[in-house]
Structure formats: structure tokens, C-alpha cells
Amino acid sequence: MAEITASLVKELRDRTGAGMMECKKALVEANGDIELAIDNMRKSGQAKAAKKAGRVAAEGVILARVENGFGVLVEMNCETDFVAKDAGFLGLANEVADFAAANKGTTIEALQAQFEEKRAALVAKIGENMNIRRVAYLDGQVIAQYLHGAKIGVLVAGEGSADELKKVAMHVAASKPEFVNPEDVSAEVVEHERQIQIDIAINSGKPKEIAEKMVEGRMKKFTGEVSLTGQAFVMDPSVSVGDFLKSVNTSVSNFIRLEVGEGIEKKEEDFAAEVAKITGGNA
């Protein structure tokens, strides 16, 4: 039996909005598998669509560069927001981004090796760990970029107007689509969601045959919600992003979205523990 920790229960609560006891029970039944627990809670009606995993905890910056025919996003992390605004940290981060743009296709390992000496020197000077974490390239005829406070970076590739593609990049930053078009949603993802929806309908008392027919309409809605062109456009929710693109004679071939600290869990300490740490245990 897997250990059901308080942090695991908290994560399930954050992602489902369900009560503490329901979350703990679901985790016990799923032997600590949080994704299975979410699926089971959705099937039983205890939770609706759960939030995606990927709690943002680490600090740092996302930087973007757009060259002729491609763009690049670079993420550099540090431990505190204070250091994320430090001139030395930002200077190194910009050097990294410039190098990545000038040397298209550089891997994250090569990028880390290239700047290891400077990174180590800055760590020694500032006294805080930092890391070049991710680099992502995107090719395209037209590339638009959008940075939201250096915490979220988006590149959108397509054809048509760069100005209109920038509006789409802003939408991607806000709405977090996972695919470009509804038809791009993988068969595995569709089947997984379809089975959950069937089980929800059956658990509500519907016969299996009726449940399967009901689900077809729900699946069309689902693929639209997770795809860029199927989502309601944030600047005009009365139209989809796809409809907006058609109206301005512009198309999207691909996009990349990075957010500082995605998937990194920062250790949390309560106030008493933090004071004790600072005072050497004499809280």
C-alpha cells in the first residue's frame, strides 16, 4: 500500500475541488495513484474536469527570440523572485537566449555546458542556486511571440498576419490549449475521456447504449476545449479562435507555451518552521 501523504491529498483537493476525506478515500482506493484517483472521482461524480498537473512553484524567467524563420524560448530558474529580477541573473539569462537564437538547434545539455562556468560563478556571488532548465525551438513562415511578465512565453507559427498571430499567442498564454486543432487530439486521449464520460452517464442511471450515444456530443465539446482553434477566443468569446483566424485570413501550424517552473514543486514550510530555521531552532 502506497503512503498517502498530506501533500498528495492537498494536490488532489487543489485539482478536483473535492473535500479532504473524499480525496483521501480516493487515493487509498487508487493506491496512491493520483491520476487514477481523479478518473475514479470523475466517474462517481465527486469531481468534474480536474485541473492539469504542473504546479508552478520555482522562480525565474522565460525569454524569447525570433529570427528569420524560427523562434526560441529559454527558461532559466532560480530560487526566489528577488533574484529573478537581479541584473546579474537577467544578464546571464539574456546571454543564454541570444546564444540559443544564434545557434539554432542547440540542446539543453549543450546550452548548460556552454554556460556552466558563468552559472557557477553567479551562484557563488549571489548565494542562490540557478539553472538553465529548458530550450524550445519553433519553425514557421511567420513567427509571433508573446511574453507575459517574463513568467509565460509563447511562440506561434503560421501564415498570414504577424499582428493577428500575436493576438493568438496572447490567447495561448491565457487559455493553455494542448493541441492546434480538434482533429489533432490523439486517439488515446479521446478514448480515455470517452470512457470516463460513458461511466459518468452509466453511473447516473443511463443504459449503456444511451450513454454511448450521449457521449458523442460531449466528445466533440471536449476536443474543442483542449484545442486552440476550437476554443472560444479570449478577445471575443462569441467566436472560436478558428473562426477568428479565418476572418483575418491567417492560419496556425504550431505553437509552444512555456511557464516558469512548470512541473517543479518547491518545498513548502509553515511559518513556525521557517522562523525556527532562521533562528536556529529557537522559535
UniProtKB/Swiss-Prot annotation:
<protein>
    <recommendedName>
        <fullName>Elongation factor Ts</fullName>
    </recommendedName>
</protein>
<dbReference type="InterPro" id="IPR001816">
    <property type="entry name" value="Transl_elong_EFTs/EF1B"/>
</dbReference>
<dbReference type="InterPro" id="IPR018101">
    <property type="entry name" value="Transl_elong_Ts_CS"/>
</dbReference>
<dbReference type="GO" id="GO:0003746">
    <property type="term" value="F:translation elongation factor activity"/>
</dbReference>
<dbReference type="Pfam" id="PF00889">
    <property type="entry name" value="EF_TS"/>
</dbReference>
<dbReference type="InterPro" id="IPR014039">
    <property type="entry name" value="Transl_elong_EFTs/EF1B_dimer"/>
</dbReference>
<feature type="region of interest" description="Involved in Mg(2+) ion dislocation from EF-Tu">
    <location>
        <begin position="80"/>
        <end position="83"/>
    </location>
</feature>
<comment type="function">
    <text>Associates with the EF-Tu.GDP complex and induces the exchange of GDP to GTP. It remains bound to the aminoacyl-tRNA.EF-Tu.GTP complex up to the GTP hydrolysis stage on the ribosome.</text>
</comment>
<keyword id="KW-0648">Protein biosynthesis</keyword>
<dbReference type="InterPro" id="IPR009060">
    <property type="entry name" value="UBA-like_sf"/>
</dbReference>
<comment type="similarity">
    <text>Belongs to the EF-Ts family.</text>
</comment>
<keyword id="KW-0963">Cytoplasm</keyword>
<keyword id="KW-0251">Elongation factor</keyword>
<dbReference type="GO" id="GO:0005737">
    <property type="term" value="C:cytoplasm"/>
</dbReference>
<dbReference type="InterPro" id="IPR036402">
    <property type="entry name" value="EF-Ts_dimer_sf"/>
</dbReference>
